Amino acid sequence: MKTDPSAEKEWLIKMNKTVPTKAAVNADSVKKESKKTLGFSALAGMDELKQLVTEGFINVLNNPECAKAYGIKPPSMLLYGPAGCGKTFFAECMAAEMDGVEFMKIEPDDLASTLIHGTQEKIGQLFDVAIHRSPTLLFFDEFDAFVPKRNNDENNYQNNEVNEFLCMLNNASDKGVYVVAATNHPERIDRAVLRTGRIDELIYVGMPDIKARESLFRIELSKLPMAEDIDYANLARMTEGYNCSDISYIVKYASRKMFNESIKCKDAPYCLITEKLLEESIAHKSPSVSSRDLKEFERLRMEFSPRNTDCVRTTVGFV
């Protein structure tokens, strides 16, 4: 879709007026943040997922001529699993690993409309912009809200929105648009969306294991005033069943405690975060994901990533 500069400028102005402003702002701001501060080095654990995405997605986009010679295109992916396990953050870090690729992060509110068929129109406009800016990594957060299961009512406007998504997802990679999505509820997604050619890979991202939890504590504490004798392995053992968001909360809770102590202290600029304080923070915070929820996710994992499937519809990440 290369045109002369003046026509291209007019086209962009037109699209920016019709596509939700929030979506456009999010796309620009997240992309800049990713390039400056994010990358796989910011992720704790997820080694198998990093390798899978690097080999099947990032290397393909970063080496287009070689990929074209072998007829290879990046697959569309759905990351699913318990909340707070880093699916959205992974997508943002993933974008930072790719050269010259536009990153657009879309949330349900970005396409919401009070007008009948308004959301349907915005879906088409969004993909038009993504194609124009290609190559584009289009990331949908809370994907189940975009493509819920359809019912038998032909006049249901939400059915029409899902149908529009199906049309847009069909071989989107042929147009330079590469779709990655995340959800905590894959069972709510219309099954037609999950067919190969629309969503090629279903990847389960589970709870962080002990090594990942230790890495999370190291990353979260690395830039804070902390004692030198913190036993990270012990903290990891104490947080069995905690997700990434829980560990982040534990560190922030301890930070707030020390902040309030520091502003009272005149003799030293900062009070150090100690292991004892972190242990108290752990006792203060219960795991966000219950054992009942984990059993349900294990059932979903077996449903969506069965043992007899090929390697691209499998379990990776924190498991």
Placement of each model-derived feature along the sequence:
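AAA+ P-loop ATPase mechanoenzymes
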Residues: 1-52, 73, 306
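Intrinsic-disorder-associated interaction segments
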Residues: 4-5, 87, 293
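A short, hydrophobic/aromatic-rich structural module that often spans a beta strand
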Residues: 8-14, 19, 111, 186-198, ...
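Charged/polar, solvent-exposed surface patches and flexible loops
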Residues: 13-17, 55, 215, 219, ...
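C-terminal engagement/docking regions of AAA+ P-loop ATPases
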Residues: 32-38, 47-51, 63-70, 237-249, ...
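Walker A/P-loop NTP-binding motif of AAA+ ATPase domains
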Residues: 34-237, 242, 254
